[in-house]
C-alpha cells in the first residue's frame, strides 16, 4: 500500500491493528481512559477495555507517528446536523515525498485516494464529495471493510473540522506544555457557525 510505504509506519500499524480493535460508536467507551496519551491508552487496553472509539485511536496513532518523526494531527470531522451527535476522528498525515497531507483512519482502517492513486486529504475528500468526483477507499493493511457504508459515513462527516492548533504528546491530558496553546482551529463552510 503506497501510503504506508510513504509513511514508513507499516510495522507500527500492523502491530497496532492486531492489538487494539475498534469500539463501534453506538457502544463507545464504557469507562473513558484517565490518561489519553500513548502510554495511558496502551495500558487502558491491557487493563480496562480492549477496544477504542475513533478519537482514542487517532490520539494513539498521532503520538506513535510523532515518535517516528512523522508529522500528523488528529482532526474531528463533523456533520452539518446539530442533532446528529455522531462525528468521526482521523489523522491527517504529512507526506513529505509528495508534499501533501493525507487522511489516515486507524479506527475504520482505511485511507482515501483519487483515480490516479494519490492519497487525499480531508479537504480534498470534501471537495470531491461536493463536486461529485470519485474517491477510492483502500483498506489499511489486510482489513476487510464495507466501503459502501464508509462512503455514506464520510458524506455526512466532511461538513466541518476541528483540530488543536498545537499538538503533541499528552495533548488531551492538560499537559502543562500546552497551557499557552489551547486554541483550536475550526474550519466551517461560509455562512455556517458550527455548534
What feature does the model see in each segment?
Residues 1-5, 11, 62, 87, ...:
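Bimodal feature
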Residues 1-52:
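Secondary-structure boundary elements
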Residues 59-133:
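Hydrophobic/aromatic-rich core segments of domains that either
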Residues 128-195:
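Low-complexity, Gly/Ser/Thr/Pro-rich intrinsically disordered linker/tail segments
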Residues 50-54, 75-77:
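Short His-Asn-centered micro-motif
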Residues 10, 52-59, 63:
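A structural signal for well-ordered alpha-helical segments within the folded catalytic domains
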Amino acid at each position: 500500500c503506497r501510503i504506508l510505504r510513504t509513511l514508513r509506519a507499516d510495522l507500527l500499524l500492523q502491530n497496532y491493528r492486531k492489538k487494539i480493535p475498534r469500539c463501534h460508536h453506538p457502544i463507545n467507551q464504557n469507562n473513558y481512559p484517565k490518561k489519553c496519551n500513548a502510554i495511558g491508552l496502551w495500558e487502558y487496553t491491557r487493563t480496562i477495555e480492549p477496544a477504542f472509539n475513533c478519537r482514542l485511536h487517532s490520539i494513539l496513532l498521532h503520538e506513535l507517528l510523532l515518535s517516528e518523526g512523522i508529522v500528523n494531527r488528529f482532526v474531528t470531522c463533523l456533520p452539518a446536523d446539530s442533532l446528529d451527535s455522531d462525528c468521526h476522528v482521523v489523522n491527517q498525515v504529512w507526506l513529505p515525498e509528495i508534499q501533501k497531507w493525507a487522511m489516515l483512519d486507524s479506527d475504520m482502517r482505511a485511507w482515501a485516494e483519487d483515480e490516479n492513486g494519490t492519497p487525499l486529504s480531508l479537504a480534498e475528500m470534501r471537495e470531491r464529495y461536493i463536486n461529485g468526483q470519485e474517491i477510492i477507499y483502500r483498506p489499511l493493511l489486510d482489513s476487510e471493510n464495507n466501503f459502501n457504508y464508509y462512503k455514506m459515513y464520510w458524506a455526512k462527516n466532511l461538513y466541518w473540522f476541528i483540530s488543536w492548533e498545537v499538538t503533541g504528546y499528552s495533548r488531551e491530558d492538560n499537559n502543562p506544555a500546552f497551557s499557552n496553546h489551547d486554541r483550536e482551529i475550526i474550519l466551517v463552510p461560509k455562512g455556517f457557525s458550527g455548534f
